[in-house]
Amino acid sequence: MAPQTETKAGAGFKAGVKDYRLTYYTPEYQVKETDILAAFRMTPQPGVPPEEAGAAVAAESSTGTWTTVWTDGLTSLDRYKGRCYDIEPVAGEENQFIAYVAYPLDLFEEGSVTNLFTSIVGNVFGFKALRALRLEDLRIPPAYVKTFQGPPHGIQVERDKLNKYGRSLLGCTIKPKLGLSAKNYGRAVYECLRGGLDFTKDDENVNSQAFMRWRDRFLFVAEALYKSQAETGEIKGHYLNATAGTCEEMLKRAECAKELGVPIIMHDYLTGGFTANTTLAHYCRDHGLLLHIHRAMHAVIDRQRNHGMHFRVLAKALRLSGGDHLHSGTVVGKLEGEREVTLGFVDLMRDDYIEKDRSRGIYFTQDWVSLPGTMPVASGGIHVWHMPALVEIFGDDACLQFGGGTLGHPWGNAPGAAANRVALEACVQARNEGRDLAREGGDVIRAACKWSPELAAACEVWKEIKFEFDTIDTL
């Protein structure tokens, strides 16, 4: 490091660059109940000691800068600084370490995920002393959780609104995702819902393009909802995507959905931004709308093992910002998801208290202090043969979304929906009777085919479909 030089301004200030670890590496520190705790996977540059790298992370994500400044003397840095209080090597990885950093609560604005992330996952990720940096987990203390509204309604209120109990919910993304006219889109929605699904969904790319303006889509979808409800006697929903180029336009679309009387709308929370998402979540609670959240762009942030941010952090942030549903991967479909890690962040989304469990990727005990839960949505390359595994893995409090697994049925959308509904109810009945779905799931589906020609046709179409690739994110 460069030598320190004393200025003429006064003997109390010495200009120059000093080692971060002299101030920000504090292994003797006892964490407080009010601290926000972070677990960073860091890969230091060659020659940089892990203690210096961990201290640099704590400094650059809190009060530090690259040099000593005289204004440090105008405040209590000891009160506001982040502290790297522990470092451990990553088993099986060369030159990778987990750095644990504690942040005092006063560093963050109440009720703002935007401010929280600006500090903790801000400029520090471009710091030259580090080859790579990944935020693996955050502990949000109850004192900070209580400053957030969280999901507009939560799992139990959603079930009460929809009058649906004792099973997973079923959904479907309308395909092709782009290019349909509003009228044909509404027809596809109607066919899926009358066939037995609970929800249909706008694709995340569907906003208000020239081939289908948002208001036209909203009107035809609302007509499909009411018609299918009248025919089936069940409450139906469609995730109308309110994501827009401005918050004002987003709220205008949400207002239209409310006036049409639909039960649920949708937002792309990463591309739309946390400020917009929190704004929409508050609107949804005030006006009785459920809020479905899509995670488009997440893999840009979370897919690399050594740099970025794990999805469990994005899931925690969404629960704070607000969303009743969140896409979470499937474990069994085409999109990535390792079982124990996926179930770890699924529990973080919907349970009230989660114990630390490193085998599931949970670095800290998390107490949500009765913040409403977010329902996980399993989607991506799933079909009727996956139903036993999905019911066994996710349980009842999940939404299972079959896009191609509904619309790809050889007889059409309604038979595809019926096949999924029959498969789900057969699996739920078998589970309730004490059967082991992990071992007997195939037999359960084959037995149900005998009294459901729609399911039999679906099973024949997808009997050979598998997505077998190694997962990237393993513990």
Curated annotation (Swiss-Prot):
<comment type="subunit">
    <text>Heterohexadecamer of 8 large chains and 8 small chains; disulfide-linked. The disulfide link is formed within the large subunit homodimers.</text>
</comment>
<feature type="binding site" description="in homodimeric partner">
    <location>
        <position position="123"/>
    </location>
    <ligand>
        <name>substrate</name>
    </ligand>
</feature>
<dbReference type="InterPro" id="IPR036376">
    <property type="entry name" value="RuBisCO_lsu_C_sf"/>
</dbReference>
<feature type="site" description="Transition state stabilizer">
    <location>
        <position position="334"/>
    </location>
</feature>
<comment type="similarity">
    <text>Belongs to the RuBisCO large chain family. Type I subfamily.</text>
</comment>
<feature type="binding site">
    <location>
        <position position="203"/>
    </location>
    <ligand>
        <name>Mg(2+)</name>
    </ligand>
</feature>
<feature type="modified residue" description="N-acetylproline">
    <location>
        <position position="3"/>
    </location>
</feature>
<feature type="binding site">
    <location>
        <position position="177"/>
    </location>
    <ligand>
        <name>substrate</name>
    </ligand>
</feature>
<keyword id="KW-0007">Acetylation</keyword>
<dbReference type="GO" id="GO:0004497">
    <property type="term" value="F:monooxygenase activity"/>
</dbReference>
<keyword id="KW-0934">Plastid</keyword>
<dbReference type="Pfam" id="PF02788">
    <property type="entry name" value="RuBisCO_large_N"/>
</dbReference>
<dbReference type="GO" id="GO:0009507">
    <property type="term" value="C:chloroplast"/>
</dbReference>
<feature type="modified residue" description="N6,N6,N6-trimethyllysine">
    <location>
        <position position="14"/>
    </location>
</feature>
<protein>
    <recommendedName>
        <fullName>Ribulose bisphosphate carboxylase large chain</fullName>
        <ecNumber>4.1.1.39</ecNumber>
    </recommendedName>
</protein>
<dbReference type="InterPro" id="IPR000685">
    <property type="entry name" value="RuBisCO_lsu_C"/>
</dbReference>
<dbReference type="InterPro" id="IPR017443">
    <property type="entry name" value="RuBisCO_lsu_fd_N"/>
</dbReference>
<keyword id="KW-0479">Metal-binding</keyword>
<keyword id="KW-0602">Photosynthesis</keyword>
<keyword id="KW-1015">Disulfide bond</keyword>
<feature type="binding site">
    <location>
        <position position="173"/>
    </location>
    <ligand>
        <name>substrate</name>
    </ligand>
</feature>
<dbReference type="Pfam" id="PF00016">
    <property type="entry name" value="RuBisCO_large"/>
</dbReference>
<feature type="active site" description="Proton acceptor">
    <location>
        <position position="294"/>
    </location>
</feature>
<feature type="modified residue" description="N6-carboxylysine">
    <location>
        <position position="201"/>
    </location>
</feature>
<dbReference type="InterPro" id="IPR033966">
    <property type="entry name" value="RuBisCO"/>
</dbReference>
<keyword id="KW-0601">Photorespiration</keyword>
<feature type="binding site">
    <location>
        <position position="204"/>
    </location>
    <ligand>
        <name>Mg(2+)</name>
    </ligand>
</feature>
<feature type="binding site">
    <location>
        <position position="327"/>
    </location>
    <ligand>
        <name>substrate</name>
    </ligand>
</feature>
<dbReference type="InterPro" id="IPR020878">
    <property type="entry name" value="RuBisCo_large_chain_AS"/>
</dbReference>
<dbReference type="GO" id="GO:0016984">
    <property type="term" value="F:ribulose-bisphosphate carboxylase activity"/>
</dbReference>
<feature type="active site" description="Proton acceptor">
    <location>
        <position position="175"/>
    </location>
</feature>
<keyword id="KW-0488">Methylation</keyword>
<feature type="binding site" description="via carbamate group">
    <location>
        <position position="201"/>
    </location>
    <ligand>
        <name>Mg(2+)</name>
    </ligand>
</feature>
<comment type="function">
    <text>RuBisCO catalyzes two reactions: the carboxylation of D-ribulose 1,5-bisphosphate, the primary event in carbon dioxide fixation, as well as the oxidative fragmentation of the pentose substrate in the photorespiration process. Both reactions occur simultaneously and in competition at the same active site.</text>
</comment>
<keyword id="KW-0120">Carbon dioxide fixation</keyword>
<keyword id="KW-0113">Calvin cycle</keyword>
<keyword id="KW-0503">Monooxygenase</keyword>
<feature type="propeptide">
    <location>
        <begin position="1"/>
        <end position="2"/>
    </location>
</feature>
<feature type="binding site">
    <location>
        <position position="379"/>
    </location>
    <ligand>
        <name>substrate</name>
    </ligand>
</feature>
<dbReference type="InterPro" id="IPR020888">
    <property type="entry name" value="RuBisCO_lsuI"/>
</dbReference>
<keyword id="KW-0460">Magnesium</keyword>
<dbReference type="GO" id="GO:0000287">
    <property type="term" value="F:magnesium ion binding"/>
</dbReference>
